[in-house]
Design a protein with these regions (language model features):
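A structural signal for multi-pass alpha-helical bundles of membrane permease subunits
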Residues: 1-170
Length: 170
């Protein structure tokens, strides 16, 4: 254990693991924001399409995800680099997965994309379990939408956030 703990490679791998774990936690607030948007959709068909569109990455196998992102993050013809080239008006060639300084960013993008739908679904279930009477009472008391969100929605979503945090770290 002494040799292992003194090894710079071991320390670097632990640091990289922590960075990737923390970066993957960005999917929790993103999933919550998307769930708030999905919760506001009243058309059942549109809501189903919305949920399916965001949950699809959880259904797709890992090999398919790798192939999709290999195409999206390519250096010369990747979708992200092409979009950046069109926006900036010059050829952009960023090695999202080949440049050692950017591999954590590329891996984090993939991780966030694959967990975003699951986080959205858990948050959506939590949002739909909040009694509407609480919002109605707060409206009668004169609370605006931000105060209702801050004092009703966020506190009642706490257990969902804790669950997503723990499963996200694992």
């Amino acid at each position: 254990y002494k040799v292992l703990l003194e090894s710079s490679g071991f320390r670097k791998s632990i640091l990289n693991t922590l960075i990737l774990a923390l970066m993957s936690l960005l999917a929790i607030p993103l999933g919550f924001v998307i769930a708030c948007g999905a919760n506001g959709v009243r058309n059942k068909k549109a809501q189903t399409v919305f949920r399916l569109g965001f949950y699809m990455p959880n259904i797709i196998t890992g090999v398919s995800i790798v192939l999709i992102f290999q195409y999206i993050l390519q250096v010369d013809n990747g979708l992200i680099n092409l979009a950046l080239s069109n926006i900036l008006g010059k050829k952009i060639e960023i090695g999202w997965l080949s440049d050692p300084s950017l591999t954590k960013v590329g891996a984090s993008i993939i991780q966030i994309w694959t967990t975003l739908g699951y986080n959205m679904l858990i948050c959506l279930a939590g949002l739909q379990s909040i009694p509407t009477e609480l919002y109605e009472a707060a409206m009668m008391d004169g609370a605006g939408s931000f105060r209702r969100w801050r004092y009703i929605t966020i506190p009642l979503m706490r257990n969902n956030f804790i669950f997503l945090f723990i499963t996200g770290i694992i």
